[in-house]
Amino acid sequence: YDEGMRAIALDSTHDGAYHLIGAWHAEVMRLSGFQKFFAKTLFGGGFLDKGNWDDAQKYLARAIALKPQNIFHRLELGEVYVDLGKYSKAREQFTAIEPLPLADVLDHTYKQEAKQILDDIKGEKDET
């Protein structure tokens, strides 16, 4: 977390740093109560209290604004939207992935994941 924030402070246009921070927030929020308890016991865990869904969305959206062709940025934000029951917004991200060119060795896999999740949430209505 600290390194990602430091990277943003040094270069406010570093899309990867914004992705890192947004993904960190999402992963902290996805931890179970037991996992959070274990992490707090083992590592002190004060840093876990920083995690929140709003920042996950904000930082990942900023990564996309900086590099809209990045498939992984869109996949990660779409997954956050699914976690939050914002299926319409998730569909927007997953649908936007399909026409994007492959630029990373994992982009083909990311496209497949997006297509699978899009199929999984077919017919889901927004919860919020």
Could you say what each language-model-derived stretch is?
Residues V28-K36, K86, I117-T128:
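Alpha-helical linker/edge segments of TPR/alpha-solenoid repeat scaffolds
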Residues A63, I71-H73, G78:
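Extended serine/threonine-enriched, polar tracts that run as long, contiguous segments within proteins
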